[in-house]
Amino acid sequence: MSNQQALVIFSGGQDSTTCLIQAIQTYGRENVQAITFQYGQRHAVELERARWIAQDLGVKQTVLDLSLMRQITHNALMDDTAAIETAENGVPNTFVDGRNALFLLYAAIYAKGQGIRHIIAGVCETDFSGYPDCRDVFVKSMNVTLNLAMDYDFQIHTPLMYLTKAQTWALADEMGVLDYIREQTHTCYNGIVGGCRECPSCILRERGLAEYLESKKAV
């Protein structure tokens, strides 16, 4: 695939960094770009991580400002004063309406301008967080919509879609970057460097790592 280019939607978290490294190994560093979105997220430390990782990996990064989302929607991920809650049923209060739809739209606009057809997103529905825009059916629908809207043959790839978090850690290990992902990425919703170990994102990350390391020990 060395003659093809890819654009990775990149937050600086575990999943998107895993996807970025996989893309570099698949397409070649010179054929990969990253796009990052500032949308008023309370865990803005991830933006700093994203910048550092992109630079460290030698990948061109573009950061787009979508903070206008604060004007039209409210959720715990964009409100520092709101408590982060996990819904027993329904959508968690950290869900940002339309976020992944906007990310894919702006990524596609940018990609077309760069002559890029492959867009990679680290969304996953296996360890389902309750986010409707992380489902495969949504991504496939958005792929069709973008192709029709821009008359362009985009291919949206979601390599983690059916992986558990433990399997995502296993993938990082297979690529030789498990320690890099552990030490350099940021996932915490509360914006705490190293993780708060209490928010849903931290719990999922740590549980998945523990499961993978335990299974590795048993082999």
UniProtKB/Swiss-Prot annotation:
GO molecular function: ATP binding; ligase activity, forming carbon-nitrogen bonds; zinc ion binding
Keyword ATP-binding on entry: yes
Co-factor requirement: Zn(2+)
Protein known as: 7-cyano-7-deazaguanine synthase
Organism of origin: Neisseria meningitidis serogroup B (strain ATCC BAA-335 / MC58)
Coiled-coil parts of chain: none
Gene transcribed to yield this protein: queC
Pathway note: Purine metabolism; 7-cyano-7-deazaguanine biosynthesis
Protein's job: Catalyzes the ATP-dependent conversion of 7-carboxy-7-deazaguanine (CDG) to 7-cyano-7-deazaguanine (preQ(0)).
Annotated binding of Zn(2+), by residue: C188, C196, C199, C202
Lineage: Bacteria, Pseudomonadati, Pseudomonadota, Betaproteobacteria, Neisseriales
